[in-house]
């Protein structure tokens, strides 16, 4: 990213300096898109409400604040309790900040002026939240465009802006959501620089974890090391999601690390480790998974499963380019997994017939990847007209879109040996006929392997953002403490 000449977000030391021009450009993009929409009247004004501080249940213990994602995309504001207004016709932006009581200075620090926030966030005007109705009245908007829509990953409805006096205005809450979501799908050059940075720091942290892991450690010790590196070296106070540090059978638990299974197993000799962790900088995410043997040396079975997943990962990245349909990439990964599992003797028979029986979903029940940005599962996966495919595996895809330049996605194929899925397949004659029970038994308790990369779709291929050891030789060298150079995948760009 070119040196920022205007206001910027920066945490000092070697952290990334992010120009506030990034958000000014996002607001400009949104206005340009809205002006092209025939349903948008002249005199329309966008109203966004930022996130609010919360407490732990009924106590006064604060929960660390993280800005609401749409508001961050448009304004880059780190403080809670704010609103943002954008005049669609002119692009003029107004930030509304809370009017703080004098006691705030005692407990929380200096109370800043409106001019401070105007300079800090490079907006056209700053007013107080309690003035929002009167300020908007003076602007005489034809309609207020508020944000209401369903997140297609969570199924939850985003919070629509509301304030005292909003009932006096004409409000439309259907136009804005699809337009701002589509803006977020395509990253600007400045946004890509932040995502390169989150991947750089998180990749370095994964390499430190690989070097540090030892048999006898607790999984959470590696979670702690990862988060410490990201924060101390990268200024990442937040993680993009709860760290998944699965060893042994836990490596087949897709979202391990939750409160009921808090990365608390002791790592044992012979385990595979699957560590899915990503740091977040200024609300921009990363999402990286590394799989490796706990003792630093792959067994023959571990190597076979790992290299099967590596082959599918690289085949997908080599095939990605504008116009490619994402479900076809999932199917490509599935087919390669089935071919490799047959080569290992776990499966036998026609791979085409296995595909027809949806056997791939037994070993990879999740989708191949998802959009990445300000949210780790970023918005825009299923806009109007893009339907979810109701087939095993494919129904878990978080998007079924055709790839276009500027999209950022994860590529995360995996092979897992999940007992209840294997038992279901063995009880189903249509699938059991392909399974070699004796060989399969050897892999009960193996866990799983996932390889997850973050990539940008370019005009002719992809740019790989993640930079960690991936081949068996590279991983073993890294875990042995060697500083041997490794070459990340390089596909068409």
UniProtKB/Swiss-Prot annotation:
E.C. no: 3.4.13.9
Entry annotated with the keyword Disulfide bond: no
Pfam families documented for this protein: AMP_N, Peptidase_M24
Residues modified as N-acetylalanine: 2
Residues reported in the UniProt entry to bind Mn(2+) 1: 276, 287, 452
UniProt remark on cofactor binding: Binds 2 manganese ions per subunit.
Top EC class, one word: hydrolase
Positions of a dipeptide binding: 255, 287, 377, 398
Summary of activators and inhibitors of this protein: Specifically inhibited by the pseudodipeptide CQ31. Inhibition by CQ31 indirectly activates the CARD8 inflammasome: dipeptide accumulation following PEPD inactivation weaky inhibit dipeptidyl peptidases DDP8 and DPP9, relieving DPP8- and/or DPP9-mediated inhibition of CARD8.
Ligand binding (Mn(2+) 2): 287, 370, 412, 452
Species the sequence originates in: Homo sapiens
Name under which the protein is recorded: Xaa-Pro dipeptidase
Keywords for the protein's UniProt record, in alphabetical order: Acetylation, Collagen degradation, Dipeptidase, Disease variant, Hydrolase, Manganese, Metal-binding, Metalloprotease, Phosphoprotein, Protease
Gene Ontology annotations of biological process type: amino acid metabolic process; collagen catabolic process; negative regulation of programmed cell death; proteolysis
Reaction equations catalysed: Xaa-L-Pro dipeptide + H2O = an L-alpha-amino acid + L-proline
Family: Belongs to the peptidase M24B family. Eukaryotic-type prolidase subfamily.
InterPro entries in UniProt: Aminopep_P_N, Creatin/AminoP/Spt16_N, Creatinase/aminopeptidase-like, Pept_M24, Peptidase_M24B_aminopep-P_CS, X-Pro_dipept-like
One GO molecular-function entry: metallocarboxypeptidase activity
Disease field: Prolidase deficiency: A multisystem disorder associated with massive iminodipeptiduria and lack of or reduced prolidase activity in erythrocytes, leukocytes, or cultured fibroblasts. Clinical features include skin ulcers, developmental delay, recurrent infections, and a characteristic facies.
CC cofactor: Mn(2+)
């Amino acid at each position: 990213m070119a040196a920022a000449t205007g206001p910027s977000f920066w945490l000092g030391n070697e952290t990334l300096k992010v120009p506030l021009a990034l958000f000014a450009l996002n607001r400009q993009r949104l206005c340009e898109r809205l002006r092209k929409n025939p349903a948008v009247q002249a005199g329309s004004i966008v109203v966004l409400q930022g996130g609010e501080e919360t407490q732990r249940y009924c106590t006064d213990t604060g929960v660390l604040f993280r800005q609401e994602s749409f508001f961050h995309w448009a304004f880059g504001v780190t403080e809670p309790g704010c609103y943002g207004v954008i005049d669609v016709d002119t692009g003029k932006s107004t930030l509304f900040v809370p009017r703080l009581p004098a006691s705030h200075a005692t407990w929380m620090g200096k109370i800043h002026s409106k001019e401070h926030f105007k300079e800090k966030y490079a907006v056209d005007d700053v007013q107080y939240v309690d003035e929002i109705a009167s300020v908007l009245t003076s602007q005489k908007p034809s309609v207020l465009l508020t944000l209401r829509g369903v997140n297609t990953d969570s199924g939850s409805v985003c919070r629509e802006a509301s304030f005292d006096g909003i009932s006096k205005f004409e409000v439309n809450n259907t136009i804005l959501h699809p337009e701002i979501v589509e803006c977020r799908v395509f990253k600007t050059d400045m946004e890509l620089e932040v995502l390169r940075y989150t991947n750089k720091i998180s990749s370095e942290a994964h390499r430190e974890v690989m070097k540090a892991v030892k048999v006898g450690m607790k999984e959470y010790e590696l979670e702690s090391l990862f988060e410490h590196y990201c924060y101390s070296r990268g200024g990442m106070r937040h993680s993009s999601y709860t760290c998944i540090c699965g060893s042994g059978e836990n490596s087949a638990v897709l979202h391990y690390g939750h409160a009921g299974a808090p990365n608390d197993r002791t790592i044992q000799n012979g385990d595979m480790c699957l560590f899915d962790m990503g740091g977040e900088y200024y609300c921009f995410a990363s999402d990286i998974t590394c799989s490796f043997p706990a003792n630093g040396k792959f067994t023959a079975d571990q190597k076979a499963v790992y290299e099967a997943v590596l082959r599918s990962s690289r085949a997908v990245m080599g095939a990605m380019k504008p116009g490619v349909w994402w479900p076809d990439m999932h199917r490509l990964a599935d087919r390669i997994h089935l071919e490799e599992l047959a080569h290992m003797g776990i499966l036998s028979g026609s791979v085409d017939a296995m595909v027809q029986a949806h056997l791939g979903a037994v070993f990879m029940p999740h989708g191949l990847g998802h959009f990445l940005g300000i949210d780790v599962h970023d918005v825009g996966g299923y806009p109007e007209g893009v339907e979810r495919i109701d087939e095993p595996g494919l129904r878990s895809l978080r998007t079924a879109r055709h790839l276009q330049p500027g999209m950022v996605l994860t590529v995360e194929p995996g092979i897992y040996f999940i007992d209840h899925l294997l038992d279901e397949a063995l009880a189903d004659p249509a699938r059991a006929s392909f399974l070699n029970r004796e060989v399969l038994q050897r892999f009960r308790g193996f866990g799983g392997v996932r390889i997850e990369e973050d990539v940008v779709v370019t005009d002719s291929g992809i740019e790989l953002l993640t930079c960690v050891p991936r081949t068996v030789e590279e991983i073993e060298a890294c875990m042995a403490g060697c500083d041997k150079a490794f070459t990340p995948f390089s596909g068409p760009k």
